[in-house]
């Protein structure tokens, strides 16, 4: 990479579309539901149904989505994903009018640009497949690791694959992952207690320290399963203490809490020496509530050993968990796994409006996966013949590729567009016919009037 880089800070949702760059953020209620399903299956800490900002810096997921670059504010407490190497320090250009002038990002001037050494191409291939049913038996961090080894295919598609029957593709049911779950201890600070998988928080911003020994060269995850938050009006706990007070004092206290409502948003912060992450979930009666109860928080990669992390509870209340796990993911085999996926990949890629094309050459049957979200509007042509499009890894387009050299073309058309145009044309034609008939029957009151 050569030359100067600049970044325009107009921080807003859908910034990638606004600035005409490829990105991992979206805020659109009519967006691709498969992408949201993927984020949910990965238990990503995104907290709304129609909005997401990246993939929580999870290195494997970034590579699987062909992410090449990563931007970080210089000096920020931000753990850089594994495999991303700094290539440039860049400057911020003049900000846009709608930027938040009070934000730290607006006021910052220097950023570091990193390049992913393990980014996968737009089309890469698998030798192994795993059914969705077998895949769902693993937790979300294990699932992330499995995606580097086997393609996830819907159960009915696995049964119909001739490549599995003839031994060209291998169906796996039991996968060994590069993850471990170290033991941990929870040390409560002031204003919080922990008992039977439940945190009782008596004051805002109370903290616990989770002590655990983490190996070096690992990515550290916190897995919250069955997360539930409850709280009640503080007035309920003051009934006994109010009995000896005067009516005036009782009224003052009662008036203070009469309009009390539970928090709109529930905040948890996770901190290590090198990373800071925030998790937000919402009250059940709000439009932003997702119904999700499982969350994974990535505390980043570190080439040194770690001894633990802090959790800060932003709200008073009761936080119940079915299970809390600390999971570390090793990268000892990461490079080898990435190279296996890109060994046979799509080359000579051409991107035009609604069309993606490329070449692929393989000496055995492979499952080709595109880092493009699946949508029924896509059609696939291999050597000019229309072929079956599969949903792979819950979110991507895919297809079985037979041995040989092939030209692969993807074409997109908005689902229902053709029939919509036909129906619209018929409707307009019928409207004109009705208008002409009405005009002939009622010449004194024509619908279609000539210009005078």
PLM feature spans:
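Active-site-proximal, structured, solvent-exposed surfaces of multi-pass membrane proteins
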Residues: 168-452
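Conserved luminal/periplasmic juxtamembrane motif of membrane-embedded glycan-processing enzymes
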Residues: 1-189, 201-205, 260-276, 287-320, ...
């Amino acid at each position: 990479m050569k030359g100067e880089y600049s970044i325009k800070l107009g921080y807003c949702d859908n910034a990638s579309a606004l600035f005409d760059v490829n990105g991992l953020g979206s805020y659109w209620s009519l967006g691709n539901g498969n992408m949201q399903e993927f984020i949910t299956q990965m238990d990503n800490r995104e907290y709304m149904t129609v909005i997401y900002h990246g993939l929580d810096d999870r290195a494997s997921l970034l590579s699987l989505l062909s992410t090449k670059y990563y931007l970080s504010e210089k000096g920020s407490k931000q753990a850089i994903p594994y495999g991303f190497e700094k290539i440039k320090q860049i400057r911020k250009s003049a900000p846009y009018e709608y930027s938040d002038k009070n934000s730290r990002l607006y006021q910052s001037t220097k950023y570091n640009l990193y390049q992913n050494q393990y980014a996968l191409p737009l089309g890469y291939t698998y030798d192994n497949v795993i059914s969705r049913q077998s895949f769902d038996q693993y937790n979300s961090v294990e699932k992330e690791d499995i995606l580097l080894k086997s393609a996830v295919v819907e159960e009915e598609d696995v049964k119909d694959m001739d490549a599995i029957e003839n031994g060209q593709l291998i169906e796996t049911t039991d996968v060994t992952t590069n993850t471990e779950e170290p033991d941990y201890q929870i040390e409560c600070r002031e204003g919080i207690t922990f008992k039977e998988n439940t945190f009782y928080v008596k004051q805002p911003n109370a903290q616990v320290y989770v002590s655990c020994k983490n190996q070096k060269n690992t990515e550290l995850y916190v897995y919250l399963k069955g997360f539930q938050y409850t709280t009640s009006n503080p007035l309920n706990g003051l009934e006994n203490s109010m009995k000896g007070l005067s009516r005036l004092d009782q009224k003052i206290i009662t008036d203070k809490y009469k309009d009390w409502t539970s928090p709109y948003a529930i905040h948890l912060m996770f901190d290590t020496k090198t990373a800071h992450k925030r998790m937000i979930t919402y009250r059940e009666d709000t439009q932003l509530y997702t119904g999700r109860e499982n969350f994974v928080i990535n505390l980043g990669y570190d080439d040194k050993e770690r001894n633990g992390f802090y959790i800060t509870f932003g709200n008073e209340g009761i936080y119940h968990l079915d299970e809390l796990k600390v999971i570390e993911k090793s990268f000892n085999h990461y490079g080898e796994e990435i190279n296996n996926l890109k060994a046979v990949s799509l080359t000579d890629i051409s991107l035009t409006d609604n069309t993606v094309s490329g070449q692929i050459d393989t000496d055995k049957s492979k499952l080709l996966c595109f880092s493009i979200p699946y949508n029924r509007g896509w059609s696939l042509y291999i050597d000019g013949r229309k072929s079956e499009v599969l949903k792979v890894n819950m979110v991507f387009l895919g297809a079985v590729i037979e041995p040989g050299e092939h030209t692969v073309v993807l074409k997109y058309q908005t689902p229902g567009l053709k029939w919509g145009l036909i129906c619209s044309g018929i409707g307009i034609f019928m409207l004109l016919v009705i208008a002409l008939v009405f005009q002939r029957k009622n010449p004194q009151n024509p619908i279609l009037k000539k210009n005078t």
